[in-house]
Amino acid sequence: MEMLPLVKIAPEYNLTLDPSTGMIGAALGREVIILSMDEINEQIAELEATADDLINSLDPTTTPLDSYPGREGVYLTAGKLTNMVYGFILGLIILFALLL
């Protein structure tokens, strides 16, 4: 396997890219310290799952990401209860305004 030259991606920070493996490392003279991106990739995957869950929460028939089984329609039920409470409070305010 042919060794490709390292590509400097940020010379001011001495960061280089190994094009054959896709690893980012710090260049110290002729030596390179290889940094593992596995932990960062795991955090990015977790963030993507959370963002997808936020988008899916706009559909009232979906379930939250870490919920127990059988929780389909929880957003729909929460929306109905919230609207009932708002309607009750608004009705009380109108009733008191008419009585005074």
Curated annotation (Swiss-Prot):
<dbReference type="Pfam" id="PF05440">
    <property type="entry name" value="MtrB"/>
</dbReference>
<keyword id="KW-1003">Cell membrane</keyword>
<protein>
    <recommendedName>
        <fullName>Tetrahydromethanopterin S-methyltransferase subunit B</fullName>
        <ecNumber>7.2.1.4</ecNumber>
    </recommendedName>
</protein>
<keyword id="KW-0472">Membrane</keyword>
<comment type="similarity">
    <text>Belongs to the MtrB family.</text>
</comment>
<dbReference type="GO" id="GO:0006730">
    <property type="term" value="P:one-carbon metabolic process"/>
</dbReference>
<keyword id="KW-1278">Translocase</keyword>
<feature type="transmembrane region" description="Helical">
    <location>
        <begin position="80"/>
        <end position="100"/>
    </location>
</feature>
<dbReference type="InterPro" id="IPR008690">
    <property type="entry name" value="MtrB_MeTrfase"/>
</dbReference>
<comment type="function">
    <text>Part of a complex that catalyzes the formation of methyl-coenzyme M and tetrahydromethanopterin from coenzyme M and methyl-tetrahydromethanopterin. This is an energy-conserving, sodium-ion translocating step.</text>
</comment>
<dbReference type="GO" id="GO:0019386">
    <property type="term" value="P:methanogenesis, from carbon dioxide"/>
</dbReference>
<dbReference type="GO" id="GO:0005886">
    <property type="term" value="C:plasma membrane"/>
</dbReference>
<keyword id="KW-0812">Transmembrane</keyword>
<keyword id="KW-0489">Methyltransferase</keyword>
<keyword id="KW-0484">Methanogenesis</keyword>
<dbReference type="GO" id="GO:0032259">
    <property type="term" value="P:methylation"/>
</dbReference>
<comment type="pathway">
    <text>One-carbon metabolism; methanogenesis from CO(2); methyl-coenzyme M from 5,10-methylene-5,6,7,8-tetrahydromethanopterin: step 2/2.</text>
</comment>
<dbReference type="GO" id="GO:0030269">
    <property type="term" value="F:tetrahydromethanopterin S-methyltransferase activity"/>
</dbReference>
<keyword id="KW-0808">Transferase</keyword>
<keyword id="KW-1133">Transmembrane helix</keyword>
<keyword id="KW-0554">One-carbon metabolism</keyword>
<comment type="subunit">
    <text>The complex is composed of 8 subunits; MtrA, MtrB, MtrC, MtrD, MtrE, MtrF, MtrG and MtrH.</text>
</comment>
